[in-house]
Amino acid sequence: MPVLEVKIGNLSFKNPVLTASGTFGYGLEYSQFVDLNILGGIVVKGLSLKPKQGNPPPRIYETPCGMINSIGLQNIGLEAFKKEKLPFLKKFNTNIIVNFFGENLDEYIEVAKLLDETEGVHALEMNVSCPNKTSEWRKMGLEPELLREAIKRVRLHIKKPLIVKLAPQVTEIALMARICEEEGADAVSLINTIPAMVIDIKTRKSMIGTLTGGLSGPAIRPVALRAVWEVAQAVKIPVIGVGGIVSAEDALQFLIAGAKAIQVGTANFINPIATVEIIEGIKQFLIEENIKDINEIIGSFKE
């Protein structure tokens, strides 16, 4: 049987298939469909210091090759997560990664410090790239020097592995990744959803509760794949590929492009066992190709 284990920083993953934040709830919601022990890791829904109500409905609109969402980072807050959700997750033999955010940099630091002290949380994913927040909040992921300051200050306060989730709508995503690396991030995940909109031609208003949302699903996969390939060449820290992955073939493309691991997002809504099928598909590919260790194909793209 081929070896599927990969390492991100000092953290080992039994396989490179993780869930994407915001598409797998807090794990409990999918536990009736998926044996969570099988997964390489679970990235839970983005958490803030206090509960957030999120954006007004409607929040989701299906597109021909994906969907536009405007959830607005609704969540139960850090303390409720620790009391109500984390005890369940700790029962499983898989890595728990908490995606987190703040309304300002001080709040980012506060959430990160509390998560760093929380038993059962293996790594943190810092969300600096959600398109469904105010422009002031979003600047951190779009402006190099603001990103640098944010990573530097958060890193000072935590010891656990830090993953930074990058925005696609920047001029040089490789530059942003290098900044993360220089300031001590252990890995980068990319890409987040792409800012998008949809209009009702009769009312001439947005068909979601906000003016714009974030596009995800197969429509963004080629964009994400190119970004992963570009970033993987620019940094030495691990890259986690995200964006439109629905099959083992999709996942393998990201690994070949240089991703150390991948996250499955929108596919979970369509097929609750997508992650398991992708893991099995990767395993079968390696057997058929007589590849003993998945690390042999990571970054094996030929120009």
Swiss-Prot record:
Substrate binds at residues 45, 69-73, 127, 192-193. CDD domains: DHOD_1B_like (cd04740). The active site is at 130 (nucleophile). It is found in: Cytoplasm. Signal peptide: none annotated. PROSITE patterns: DHODEHASE_1, DHODEHASE_2. It is an enzyme of class 1 (oxidoreductase). One of its GO terms (molecular function) is dihydroorotate dehydrogenase activity. Its EC number is 1.3.1.14. Coiled coil: none annotated. It catalyses: (S)-dihydroorotate + NAD(+) = orotate + NADH + H(+). Its cofactor is FMN. Pathway: Pyrimidine metabolism; UMP biosynthesis via de novo pathway; orotate from (S)-dihydroorotate (NAD(+) route): step 1/1. FMN binds at residues 21, 45-46, 99, 127, 165, 191, 217, 243-244, 265-266. Catalyzes the conversion of dihydroorotate to orotate with NAD(+) as electron acceptor. This is Dihydroorotate dehydrogenase B (NAD(+)), catalytic subunit. The lineage of its organism: Bacteria, Pseudomonadati, Nitrospirota, Thermodesulfovibrionia, Thermodesulfovibrionales. The gene is pyrD.
